[in-house]
Amino acid sequence: MAFSKFGKMFRLPTIEIKKKTKQYNHLQRDVNPNDMWEIIGELGDGAFGKVYKAQNKETGVLAAAKVIETKSEEELEDYMVEIDILASCNHQYIVKLLDAFFFDNKLSIMIEFCPGGAVDAIMLELDRGLQEPQIRVICKQMLEALQYLHSMKIIHRDLKAGNILLTLDGDIKLADFGVSAKNTKTLQRRDSFIGTPYWMAPEVVMCETMKDAPYDYKADIWSLGITLIELAQIEPPHHELNPMRVLLKIAKSEPPGLDQPSKWSMDFNDFLKKALDRHPETRPTAAQLLEHPFVSSVNTNRPLRELVAEAKAEVMEEIEDNHEDGEDEDPADLTPVQAPTKDPSQTSATSLNGDHPHGTCYAETSMEIEEEPSTLESTKTPLKEQEDNLSDKFQVEDHDKPESEASGKASSSDSGIEDGKSTPTSEEDTKTVEASEPELPVQRTPTPAEEPEYPSETMEKYLEKPKEPEKEDHCEETQPVLKRIQLKDPNGRMSVVSNRSSFAGDDAESLVSHTNGRLSNRYSDVASDSMDISLNLSGDLSVNKEMGTISLRDSKKTLKRTRRFLVDGVEVSVTTSKIITDDEKKDEEMRFLRRQELRDLRLLQKEQHRSLTVLNMKLKEQREQMHRRFDQEMNAKKKYYYTELEALEKHQKQTIERMETEHSNSLREEGKRIRVEQEKAYQKFLDQMKQKKKEVKQEVEKMPRNQRKDTMKMKMNNYQQMRSDEEQKFIADQKEYLDVTLKSIISKNKHEISETERQCLLKKQNLVREREATLWDMEEKNLHERHQLHKQQLKDQYFLQRHQLLKKHEKEQEQMLHYNLRMVELLKARQQQERNRLPKIQRNEAKTRMVMFKKSLKINSSGSAAEDREKVKQFSRMEEKRQKAERLHQQQKHENQMREMLSQCDGNTRELQQLQNEKCHLLIENETQRLKSLDEQHNQQLKEWREHLKPRKKVLEDELTLRKRAGAFLQDDG
């Protein structure tokens, strides 16, 4: 029985805790979401949980189900901010909350499903940025959504392409309010360091180390500008930097812009300039930006409908294996690329209207439009002009560098990351063809029998342009590709517009010679002066060992993607070709690793934000406790003095009443005593009168009898008159004495009472002075205590910030270490590939050079066969020496590369340490300044309080003096 009672006692608190569980308006507890929603697929993996595609079992409505593992009520409260924001928002361009469940320690948030997907995923799928009309529509819709959010006192704080979803109707939906803030007033400021680094505004970045400069809703305007750059260039500014290291770049550098501003409209550039204003005070609001010419003219969302249609189009993929056995083949022929490109803001129009051919130097694009019959016109251009146009507008890339796919709709930059750094396409990388320029000659593809062979001189001119200084830095990588556009003629036949070149024999040799001629001098010190033919051959078939490329084609695969979709009843077919290399896999791996770093940062931010929230709640509770304690002490002191005053007044009243009673009694007793004495005196007076009467009678009796009667009568009349006068006088004297005596006693009593009242008044005033002095001392003490508490709380906040910063620095160093290891491993792998490839290259070269040397001996032979054999042996020995020198050179090159890589890694580590030290120093400086400012503020507050104390004392003394005078006046009147 006893144990059961104890069990009940111990179970009671648990029951009470369950009853106290906080209830939320928009969250269903203990309801299994699987009873109402069916999971039909997985959409992705977010920073805090997985996202599934779900369908309502009753209505069939689709939703994106965000499932988050939630371990405590505190974590649940963090996620409730997003749920409350979504529930309170009802806007065309903001995702809607359909349901929210908390079941089995899992939070399930059902959000409106957007079939178009996220914009960043669309850009990766199409391998290009968006065109300007599409960016305009997205920008306008985002501004309208932001205007609504800001009017609802909500700061999104995480705007980016990944949080912009598209519907099939061509509308956007802002999503992911996980780090958003809901304020109580529009101009409320925040100091939380939260968001994704690349899109953070400078004032948000500064909150990492400076909490005294909070930000407001205009931080979203900066993120909007960065997002527009991301839409145009696939990646945000500074994307080549580590997520942890980009923060200092944002804080110190000038506002970013487009990599190639000339390729975009002036309105776009001006819009970005206004949105990316470093000063939040002058940064425009969403309502002001809606009046900007960049978005004010947008009245349709057709560009987004086209984008969604292309992204959701049926895709047919075909992989072509380009493997060729290098040992059995002739030197590879490099086909010049006919790939005029267009401005990124014009590319989508090309894909839909088919007015101009376009593409890039490394992607094969085929576009097919089935609408109205079209004819194919061929313009005749002199060969020299063709060569100049081609040499100006085409570039050749190397085999072994990573290629980034260019879709049939864009000449996009490389969105991948090589060696952890971006390789964006600059103006030198990809030339564009403006609409005003004449189009390149269009040639029908000849049959194999009539396929023309370009003269070697023509091909030399094709490949001499990349040797120019401004091209070498950007066009060292060459890639043979074919540009093809397919159009249907009126008869329904497919015409293929292409530009092909075939090389054979000496033409190929001449082409290779001119392509790699700039590298021929590298090995000139190996051959003997007497071996001129050997030097010539070495120059003709030199190998680009620096870049690890060869003159023969490597084994590669080409991925062809064909998309077919309808736009306003027009069927559009876009074919893109992309050469698959190992480097692309590395780029994808680097992209994945960077996403992982961002995810780690997001988790770290969330954890830090939660810790900071817990600390702020603790500090707030401390302040409230101190305030309550101060109020309690103040009220206790006031109550004490109020009680003392009441007791003093009560004692005074009782004393006065007692004195009055005593005085009344004494007055009554004295009056009674005097009256008794006066009665006795009166009796004595009467006795004296009687005695005098007797004396008169005796005197009359002594007289003769005949005189007695008249004399008696006369004497008695005189006696009666004298007695009456004496009696009246005696009584009057007695009365006067009584009155004087009583008045004297009353006056004495009044004086005693007034003196007592005066003493009590002095005591009361002294008590009031003591009370006010005590309260003033308590106020001053409270000021000091409050200052000390604020100071300690500030130190606690900065201690947590330092702890979080050190934790973040450890994460940065860990990521930097992994990054450096990845770079070293990639370099080792590449060098191993080059070492493995070099023997094969040398065998192929030796075989080809030997064949050519023997041919030259046959042509120029002037000696015997023995001499020719000796020359062949000598040539073989020279080849062996040359190959040995090449291997040695490669080894030295690899060692230099490794040293440079290790030096670069050390430099990265030192730079990171320097940045971290700067952050720590900045945080310490800011803490010192805040503490100093807090001390100055306290001193100023104390000074003002003391200045205000003097008039308060004077007012009190004046009031007490007035009361004292009033009491004295009343006493005088009394």
Curated annotation (Swiss-Prot):
Residues 37-295 form the Protein kinase domain. ATP binds at L43, G44, D45, G46, A47, F48, G49, K50, V51, K66. The active site is at D158. Gene3D superfamilies: Phosphorylase Kinase, domain 1, Transferase(Phosphotransferase) domain 1. Its main location: membrane. One of its GO terms (biological process) is protein autophosphorylation. Autophosphorylates. SUPFAM superfamilies: Protein kinase-like (PK-like). The keyword Cell cycle applies. Keywords: ATP-binding, Cell cycle, Cell membrane, Coiled coil, Kinase, Membrane, Nucleotide-binding, Phosphoprotein, Serine/threonine-protein kinase, Transferase. InterPro entries: Kinase-like_dom_sf, PKK, Prot_kinase_dom, Protein_kinase_ATP_BS, Ser/Thr_kinase_AS, STE20_Ser/Thr_Kinases, STK10_STKc. It is found in: Cell membrane. Its EC number is 2.7.11.1. Residues 605-729, 870-950 form a coiled coil. GO terms for cellular component: cytoplasm; plasma membrane. GO terms for molecular function: ATP binding; protein homodimerization activity; protein serine kinase activity; protein serine/threonine kinase activity. Residues 320-332 have a biased composition (Acidic residues). Residues 382-406, 458-477 have a biased composition (Basic and acidic residues). Residues 320-479 are annotated as: Disordered. It catalyses: L-seryl-[protein] + ATP = O-phospho-L-seryl-[protein] + ADP + H(+); L-threonyl-[protein] + ATP = O-phospho-L-threonyl-[protein] + ADP + H(+). Homodimer. May act as a polo kinase kinase by mediating phosphorylation of plk1. This is Serine/threonine-protein kinase 10. It comes from Danio rerio.
